[in-house]
Amino acid sequence: MKQLLFDLCRIGGVSGSEEPIAKFCAEKLSAFADTTIDKNGNVIATLGNANADKTILLDAHLDRIGFIVTSINENGFVKVASCGGIDVRVLSDAVLVSCSDEPVKGVVCCMPPHLSDGGEDKAAPIDKVWIDFGLPYEKVAEKIKIGDVLTFYGEPKELMNNRITAPALDDRCGIAALIRCAELIGKKELSYKVVILLSVQEETYGTGAKTGAYRINADEAIAVDVSFASQPDVSGQYAGVELAKGPMICISPILSKAMSDKLISVAKEKNIPFQYEPISGTTGTNADHISVTKSGVASCLLYTSPSPRD
């Protein structure tokens, strides 16, 4: 499972450019399910009883945050705009890599503190950031084009105490969990149809969830994503959330209470540890889109780990 997650995190797939990760996931799922990639780039895998009256949808998103190239200046420095929610605090000196057939690495330029006048001690906004690929304009223009996408470069790493760190754990954790789910279900005879939707563009517009859920027309849905955990100075609802203490079941007025209660009931019955995430409104995940598809889909949200236990 760990190797699968590491493999997933090494693959590109910035919003709108999910082809590499879609292809990888489709190949994995095809071993267990009837799998296709639709015209929007969603991966759709069908298991269980194809003729059943009831369909349950399991969703995780393919895309990861990144950047789109907007201009290249005469010195070969590249300007970008964000694709998804970028925390500008992590950009200083970050290494980015182009999502192309021949990836090229560059570093985010920042003002050295020795040269700063004191007014540049805050994180620079995206529109003030330049990427340095270490090449003159002519060479950069050969390798980087306007509209190309970049993402954060970094190898998955194993930490102590069975912890890991990697780029794109949002939502490669969810994908790993659903691939494992497909493996466990396999060719089992079920009284209902299960459709796994690995959706595109969650980080930007939710296109994949909107169109995929419309096509699948499920009765019920579980969206699988990631959330926050306790760390120094964190207070409020996340202060008590801990790693390795089980997935978080979301409680929200826009979700189906019956579905959320069912998740809680099953977890207790099977002795699966879990935690709560209460949210007072929309969740910022694909569950928001899926729940209002067509005449409505009874939806719940699971913030999961890639542990087979969960």
Report each predicted region and the residues it spans:
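N-terminal hydrophobic/helix-forming segments and targeting peptides
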Residues: 1-305, 309
